[in-house]
Design a protein with these regions (language model features):
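Sec/Tat signal peptide C-region and signal peptidase I cleavage site
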Residues: 15-20
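Sec-dependent N-terminal signal peptides
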Residues: 4-14
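Subset of outer-membrane beta-barrel
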Residues: 21-319
């Protein structure tokens, strides 16, 4: 089992490098954060170790840290008129293996349908859905591996497309030093039913991240490098960083910054030589979480640009 996981990870790295310059336009809702904890830390985090099923969406290897029979429900408002929801439930097989079932859904709302003369003839809706199964396994004392197999469908009016893909993840965690490092390949796959004859790929994303909690201090810091299969923009814009203030085992507050989100959302202010660009807070994120026995509530807020933000709520309950 250990050799299989390591071989798969190495194969993914090679494939990601070979496809580094390919466009990523299909099923990009899979890039959205599902975990409010990860959202608060900048939107991408693959390395924090918590008893939290929603982190499985970020890294399938993190399922090994989740308690048996935990139900997780998530809801997020995203941009204008778009809402997304997700759910997860897991089982612990033994001291090494766990599995989970995951689901994601996004509704983009109603849109106008017009003819070639721009005359409105009605309305149509658009939505996307993903269903997945995850398996994680302890490959060694401190090393976990995980795989998620996912089916994805997109519906626009009376048309639809379908795809299949996998996520692969590794996590090394040393509980004595509270240091965690992970590598993840997300969304390797492609369409088997396209809207037209142009079959596309899923939004492949190679990520590496690390988290560290300091001894005798209530802080944990995280840094994640994302989209490492594309190098046509500056290195700093691959970085997502975050910090947590862990007030107790039951409560934390967190903040993060996503450099690429801030860069992409900059808008010009002024004209001529006096013109400047400002992100108006885009890239910033905040959140908090609390746990009461078997119940956990987490909230994450992120700024996308001057007129758009998201609010993500997670609820988990151990049965």
């Amino acid at each position: 089992m250990r050799k299989i996981f390591l071989y798969l990870i190495l194969s993914i790295v090679a494939t990601a490098t070979a496809n580094a310059q390919e466009s990523q336009t299909e099923y990009n809702f899979l890039r959205l954060p599902v975990s409010a904890h990860a959202a608060a830390l900048g939107g991408d985090n693959v390395s924090i170790i918590e008893d939290d099923p929603s982190l499985t969406f970020s890294n399938p290897a993190l399922l090994s840290s989740v308690s048996d029979k935990t139900l997780n429900l998530n809801f997020m408002t995203y941009m204008e008129g778009a809402i997304t929801g997700s759910a997860a439930v897991n089982r612990v097989v033994n001291d090494k293996a766990s599995w989970a079932v995951l689901g994601q859904y996004i509704n983009y709302g109603k849109m106008k349908e017009t003819d070639q003369n721009n005359v409105q003839t009605g309305e149509f809706s658009a939505q996307e859905i993903a269903l997945a199964g995850t398996f994680s396994y302890m490959l060694a004392k401190n090393l976990a591996g995980g795989i998620t197999a996912r089916w994805v469908a997109s519906y626009i009016g009376g048309y639809n497309s379908m795809a299949a893909g996998i996520d692969l993840g590794l996590n090394y965690y040393d509980p004595e030093s509270e240091f965690s490092v992970s590598a993840v390949a997300k969304n390797l796959g492609g369409q088997f039913k396209a809207y037209d004859e142009d079959y596309g790929k899923m939004p492949l994303d190679l990520q590496i991240g690390a988290s560290k909690r300091f001894a005798n201090m209530p802080f944990r810091i995280s840094a994640t490098l994302v989209d490492l299969n594309h190098w046509d923009y500056s290195f700093i814009n691959h970085l997502v960083c975050g910090v947590e203030l862990i007030l107790s085992d039951q409560f934390y507050v967190a903040g993060g910054y996503n450099f690429r989100r801030a860069h992409d959302m900059k808008i010009a202010e002024g004209t001529g030589e006096d013109a400047s660009k400002s992100s108006h807070g885009a890239g910033l994120s905040f959140g908090a979480g609390m746990q009461l026995e078997r119940f956990k509530l987490q909230v994450g807020y992120a700024k996308y640009h001057v007129s758009a933000n998201s609010l993500l709520v997670n609820v988990s309950y151990s049965l």
